[in-house]
Amino acid sequence: MANRLVLSGTVCRAPLRKVSPSGIPHCQFVLEHRSVQEEAGFHRQAWCQMPVIISGHENQAVTHSITVGTQITVQGFISCHKAKNGLSKMVLHAEQIELIDSGD
C-alpha cells in the first residue's frame, strides 16, 4: 500500500526535542502549508497545519537548523497518533527534510 507525502511550508511551532527511553531522539514540530491548487479546472486555496515528527540519530542534524519561520520540504509517511485526550490526529513521519532557500 502506498503511503507517501511531500509537503512544503513554514514551521509554525517551535521544535520539541525528546529522547525515548530506548535512546532514540525525536524532534516534533508543526508545519503550516499554504498554496493555490487547481481542482476541476478551478483555482482554490489550500491550507493545513500538519504535525511532523522525525526520529533517529541520522536525521537529527538537520533539525538543529529548524526554528519557527523556517521554510522546509518534508517527505515521509502519515500515521495516526492518539493524543492524551483520546482523540486521534494525523502526523507526518519525516524521512527527509530539505531547507528551502528563502533567497535572503
Curated annotation (Swiss-Prot):
One Pfam family cited in the UniProt record for this chain: SSB_1
Keyword DNA-binding on entry: yes
SUPFAM superfamilies named in the record: Nucleic acid-binding proteins
GO molecular-function terms, A-Z: single-stranded DNA binding
Gene Ontology BP term (one): DNA replication, synthesis of primer
Coiled coil location: none
Domain SSB: 1-101
Keyword Hydrolase assigned: no
InterPro entries membership: NA-bd_OB-fold, Primosome_PriB/ssb, Prisomal_replication_PriB
Keywords per UniProt: DNA replication, DNA-binding, Primosome
Gene Ontology CC, one term: primosome complex
Role noted for this protein: Involved in the restart of stalled replication forks, which reloads the replicative helicase on sites other than the origin of replication; the PriA-PriB pathway is the major replication restart pathway. During primosome assembly it facilitates complex formation between PriA and DnaT on DNA; stabilizes PriA on DNA. Stimulates the DNA unwinding activity of PriA helicase.
NCBIfam families: PriB_gamma
Assembly behavior: Homodimer. Interacts with PriA and DnaT. Component of the replication restart primosome. Primosome assembly occurs via a 'hand-off' mechanism. PriA binds to replication forks, subsequently PriB then DnaT bind; DnaT then displaces ssDNA to generate the helicase loading substrate.
Family: Belongs to the PriB family.
Name of this protein: Replication restart protein PriB
Species assigned in the record: Cronobacter sakazakii (strain ATCC BAA-894)
Gene name linked to the record: priB
